[in-house]
Amino acid sequence: MLTAMREFFKKHIQAIRPYEPGKPIKELEREMELRSIIKLASNENPLGPSRKALRAIRRAIPEIHLYPESSCYELVGRLSEELGIPQNQLIIGNGSNEIIELLARGFLSEGDEVISSECSFLVYPILTQVCGAKYVSVPMKNYGYDLKGILNAITDRTRLIFIANPNNPTGTYVTQQEVEEFIAKVPKNVVVCFDEAYVDFVEATDFPHMMFHIKTEKPNIVVLRTFSKAYGLAGLRVGYAAASPEMIGYLHKIRQPFNVNSLAQTAAAAALDDRFFLWRTKLLVSSGRKYLYKRLRRLGLTYIPSQANFVLMDTGRDAQEVFQALLRQGMIVRSMKAYGLSTWIRVTVGRRSQNAQFYRLLRKYLKSQQ
């Protein structure tokens, strides 16, 4: 029966290796017989959601029997004020992942090509395959995007380029100058999507100001952002894109009419107003990164300086073994084997106590391997 069912699906769908999210914490606690687990694997906000967002959700609950506002009018209006971008240049998605999917569906046909880095967000190749297109993976340069390499990989079949900036899972970034030189050379019929999911954690002074290109209506530039990371709303699934009015108009044509639920819209709009919460989050991540760097140097481990809320490190041991060893002690991190980094793990910056516990457990494991 399974073999017969397989034949119903297109061949390029059959070949897809699905994205594998981590197991729920409660399930792992039962399986591992642990009383509590610290999760530093998915780059979530350790402070939780904004209190203003929670209050907004409570006020909105009595109206959940009504369909949500299809255009996300209130949230788009708040973002327009925040970013200084007209409302017709913004679209809200069920997480920024949905907008990545809209771009793939809108631009890709079988045989088309998508270019990105060899070590970047795993959703890019999956959605490329869903559309029957070819994913072109350009080797990294210093654990980041090689923009010159991407330019050299462009062919007449190239339709989309994805650039995660800062990059996930490495935390590296491309600079303002690099981006300007890159954009000037990309053919106008190729859409370049800058995925800025982690932009709120950036401290580099030469990080590119991509919203400037949106304000000047560059027709082939799209910028993605999310409320899942710094704003602490990962469970509600809210993201957005900024692009030219024409681009946004076409994306609206193919999105689901009620794609973002009413509680998510309300919470996101309220979260934008909670500047103190955002400041606390940034401070926590900044200090947490420095703490981890110092401890990793003490252990003699290589790490990649990060502009995001996570740190990528080389343990010198099999990444899956390190993952399992930490999991048995109640700590979830992310093995990077799926990215071809066989001895590397990625760790979300948590609260100070969580970061300290991670360091203690990693140190204990490494000593046991000597």
Which positions does each model-derived feature cover?
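PLP-dependent enzyme catalytic core of the Aspartate aminotransferase-like
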Residues: 1, 325-329, 333-334, 338-370
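N-terminal "arm"/small-domain region of PLP-dependent enzymes with the aminotransferase-like
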Residues: 2-66
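Short acidic capping loops at alpha-helix termini that bridge into adjacent secondary structure
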Residues: 36, 86-90, 110-113, 157, ...
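PLP-dependent aminotransferase class I/II
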Residues: 50, 71, 220-304
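Phosphate-binding glycine-rich loop
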Residues: 64-113
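PLP-dependent aminotransferase-like
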Residues: 106-163
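Active-site pre-lysine segment of PLP-dependent enzymes
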Residues: 147-157, 169-192, 196-228
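Conserved PLP-binding catalytic core of the aspartate aminotransferase-like
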Residues: 286, 295-329, 345
